[in-house]
Curated annotation (Swiss-Prot):
Transmembrane segments: none annotated. InterPro entries: 4pyrrol_syn_uPrphyn_synt_sf, 4pyrrol_synth_uPrphyn_synth, UROS/Hem4. One of its GO terms (biological process) is protoporphyrinogen IX biosynthetic process. It comes from Pseudomonas aeruginosa (strain ATCC 15692 / DSM 22644 / CIP 104116 / JCM 14847 / LMG 12228 / 1C / PRS 101 / PAO1). Catalyzes cyclization of the linear tetrapyrrole, hydroxymethylbilane, to the macrocyclic uroporphyrinogen III. Pfam families: HEM4. Pathway: Porphyrin-containing compound metabolism; protoporphyrin-IX biosynthesis; coproporphyrinogen-III from 5-aminolevulinate: step 3/4. The gene is hemD. It is an enzyme of class 4 (lyase). It comes from the Bacteria. Its EC number is 4.2.1.75. Keywords: Lyase, Porphyrin biosynthesis. This is Uroporphyrinogen-III synthase. It catalyses: hydroxymethylbilane = uroporphyrinogen III + H2O.
Length: 251
């Protein structure tokens, strides 16, 4: 596996953790974060959502930043969390919640809303009178999960905790990094990260798009192919073990 030289594009803190795991496996990596996370100020409406947390039969946490920021709110308002189902769309997010002491339901395979919806344990949590679900996430984002749940008669509320933005890099920075460090693979962890990669590449995309591109889900894989990426590898998850398994298979 030591032949891989990867560009990591997650937010700073996540890049550092992933780089450490890859380094232990003998994989060289270089970090160029393509997503920055800015926490949002709490509004009175959001405070009310947290104070009413015990109204929800399930809380869905969609990302690691949402988990970290959501737990800060939970600690502030609920020293003893109410009894309800906590869910995440991936193992890495679940690990943050579990470290806090929560029991978490999450899909073993796949880091997306589709995989969560297919979980019997999640569907079981909705079989109550007047089911309500709170989704902790970033500002904006996919509506798929909420739409599907509302189609099942579930009331869905959002708790936006952060805003994503693309860091500023000079034109040509991406290709210059790839060439200077002889990188032979790219890793993205979300659809927005992929879009930011594509926009940063700009006129260099034809060359960048020829590199193997490791993505976390079938949805992001399809997005990458639509953008013209020539070799897309679906890791079926955004965790380090999922990426390492995909690297072994793709070698």
């Amino acid at each position: 596996m030591s032949g891989w030289r990867l560009l990591l594009t997650r937010p700073d803190e996540e890049c550092a953790a992933l780089a450490a795991s890859l380094g232990e496996a003998g994989v060289h990596s270089s970090s160029l974060p393509l997503l920055a996370i800015d926490p949002l100020e709490e509004t009175p409406e959001q405070r009310t959502l947290m104070l009413d947390l015990d109204r929800y039969c399930a809380v869905v946490v969609v990302s690691k930043p949402a988990a970290r920021l959501g737990l800060e709110r939970l600690d502030r308002y609920w020293p003893q969390p109410p009894q309800q189902t906590w869910c995440s769309v991936g193992a890495a997010t679940a690990a943050i919640l579990e470290a806090y002491g929560l029991d978490v339901t999450y899909p073993e395979q796949g880091d997306d809303s589709e995989a969560l919806l297919a979980l019997p344990a999640f569907q079981d949590s909705l079989r109550v009178h007047d089911p309500k679900v709170l989704i902790m996430r970033g500002e904006g984002g996919r509506e798929f999960l909420a739409e599907r749940l509302r189609g099942q008669g579930v009331q869905v509320d959002y708790l936006p905790l952060y805003r994503r933005r693309a860091p500023d890099y000079p034109a040509g920075e991406l290709l210059a990094r790839v060439r200077a460090e002889r990188l032979n693979g790219l890793v993205v962890s979300s659809g927005q990260g992929l879009q930011n990669l594509y926009q940063l590449a700009a006129a260099d995309w034809p060359e960048i798009g020829r590199l193997p591109l490791f993505v976390p889900s079938p949805r992001v894989a399809e997005m990458a192919r639509e953008l013209g990426a020539q070799r897309v590898i679906d890791c079926r998850g955004a965790s380090a073990p999922a990426l390492l398994a995909a690297l072994t298979s793709a070698a």
